[in-house]
Amino acid sequence: MEKLLHWSIANAQGDDEAKARAGQPDPKLLEQLFGGGPDEPTLMKHAMAVISNPEATLENKLVAFDNFEMLIENLDNANNIENMKLWEPLITVLDDPEPELRAFALSVTGTAVQNNDQSQNNFAKYDGALAKVIKLASGRAEDAQVRTKAFYTLSNLIRHNKLIYDQFNQLNGLQIIAPVLKDANASEKLKLRAMALLSTVLTVADMNADFFALLRAYNIIETTLEFLHPECNLYLIDRVLNFFSQLINVGFEFSATELEKLKVGVKNIEPVEAQLNEDDYKTVQYVSK
């Protein structure tokens, strides 16, 4: 870069001697600086070619994934995944034996579909794609980072998209939440991702008796009640209170057994009340009295 600066100054001044001393700049560097390199769709294709190449090293594939994810943070580039037929090779990586690649494929997918209904629908139309993400999220033997990224991706796929939530529901997606929350070996980060997915579901599901029955059938109400304890992660407690608050606001009624556990739970978390969301706490506290 310093050499390019000297050359630029000498060239502007018309100093032949100084230009000779500076030498010719690197053509590739000039391309990068003045926009003469490949356009972003081409870079996306190149990155996916590396990712899909069985001869490429893991390190090179991870670098290519990193570059690809930075590119698709742009909405137009995210939508170009479909236009350039790159969803299929990306979805194929979800079956790769290397967990780092599976995690990156999920991360890229989650980023591409975030607040982007066009890319959400593009992904979901591929046969078995949503089911693969659900399977990766639910697998207890799966790599922890892969599971965390899978929950992130599911949340971003479902958010503000009723059609994809309906597909998720048809695949019994809600049943993957309680096992994570009950798993003593699951990280708090994974449990927070599971609660984030649950919160996202509440924004698109029909809040009716059938949905409430599903929450009970999949042990979600019972399991979340167990987090109302001061020794639990405060962020998890907050997530649970928000979950209950949203249910209460749409007319959900706790059973007698659930209400008794709720009363005990609210009493248990009184010592940390000041560190919790005030509105959610008071809503749940009022019902528990």
Swiss-Prot record:
Question: Keywords for this entry?
Answer: Cytoplasm, Repeat, Translation regulation
Q: Where in the cell is it found?
A: Cytoplasm
SUPFAM superfamilies per UniProt: ARM repeat
Task: Give the record's GO CC terms.
Answer: endoplasmic reticulum
Q: Which GO terms describe its molecular function?
A: adenyl-nucleotide exchange factor activity
Q: What Pfam families does this protein's entry cite? A: Fes1
Q: Which residues form a coiled coil?
A: none
Q: Which cysteines are joined by disulfide bonds?
A: none
Write out the ranges of the repeats annotated as ARM: 13-56, 75-114, 118-159, 162-203, 209-249
GO BP annotations listed: regulation of translation
InterPro entries under this entry?
ARM-like (IPR011989), ARM-type_fold (IPR016024), Hsp70_NEF-Inhibitors (IPR050693), Nucleotide_exch_fac_Fes1 (IPR013918)
Taxonomic superkingdom: Eukaryota
Family matches, as PANTHER family: HSP70-BINDING PROTEIN 1, PROTEIN FOLDING REGULATOR
Q: Which family does the entry's similarity section mention? A: Belongs to the FES1 family.
Describe the task this protein carries out: Functions as a nucleotide exchange factor (NEF) for Hsp70 chaperones which accelerates the release of ADP. Required for fully efficient Hsp70-mediated folding of proteins.
Protein's recorded name: Hsp70 nucleotide exchange factor FES1
